[in-house]
Amino acid sequence: MALLPHFSTLGSGHTVLMLHDADGGHLTFAPQVEALASLGYRAVAWDMPGYGNSAPIEPYRFKGLAEACMALIDALQCGPVTLVGHGMGAMVALEVAVRQSALVRRMVLCAGGPALDAQAMADWVEPRLAALDATQGDMQSLAQALVPQFTGSGALPEGVRLATHALSQVYRGSYRRALQALSTFDRSAGVLGRLHMPTLIIGGAQDRCTPPAALQALAHVLPDARHLSLPHAGHWPQLEDPDGFDGALADFLASSRVLH
């Protein structure tokens, strides 16, 4: 039996499971873990396979990542859950929802989802792979060089520091495998259009990895989705503008809890 992914948890109530991006581990949701627990939710943030203390998987593809996430939900005996996915984690959330929609009550997709086209995916992945090669796998140097390129003009300095620290802790081999896996997400609009759970799509207006146009396109595909853009944030909205992000998240959870 495969080992369960490592996770942190705080609070009790309906489970909100947070799935981080390729650019960091569970720490990239640290502010939200505390905020959600204080609002009466059970906040869980995982380390994706190959990150933190979570065992890697081979092949490193969305099928295996989704299976690891579903195994964690099953082990926690907490389904259906709210999935909050950032970046690559948003794609994992979508893959889980496609494979086992009964496990997912609602979704929050943050700065992530299918790319508009191959060039958009290259714009996301290639600078990271180039930085990985240029720094010879020195993740601290990579993080210090990369994070400022993708944050917004109004980013909270503490959030930028946390994003930088989280990326510096990623294993270089896992980072490369995760980046290479990004382009393999192949769920079509027709498949995603069958996901009827309430969904909040939130991103930074200054995000050059997943720009507002990409998130708006995803919002048009999902039947029960709405899109929100935080004006001065980049690729880490939950860290760059935690007040704006947490407020939108809390409102969405409260309203969908009443309506659904």
Language-model-detected regions and their locations in the chain:
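Flexible "cap/lid" loop of the alpha/beta hydrolase fold
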Residues: L94, V98-R99, V104-T135
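Gly/Ala-rich beta-loop-alpha elbow adjacent to hydrolase catalytic centers
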Residues: G85, G89, A93
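Short beta-strand/loop motif that positions the catalytic acidic residue
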Residues: L195, I201-G203, D207
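Conserved HGGG/HGGXW glycine-rich cap/lid loop of the alpha/beta-hydrolase fold
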Residues: S8-A55
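Catalytic histidine-centered segment of alpha/beta-hydrolase-like enzymes
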Residues: A233-P242, D246
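Conserved alpha/beta-hydrolase catalytic His-Asp/Glu region
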Residues: A118-D123, Q136-G193
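Alpha/beta-hydrolase fold catalytic core
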Residues: M1-L17, S38-Y41, C78-G79, G247-H260
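Conserved acidic catalytic loop of the alpha/beta-hydrolase fold
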Residues: G64-V81
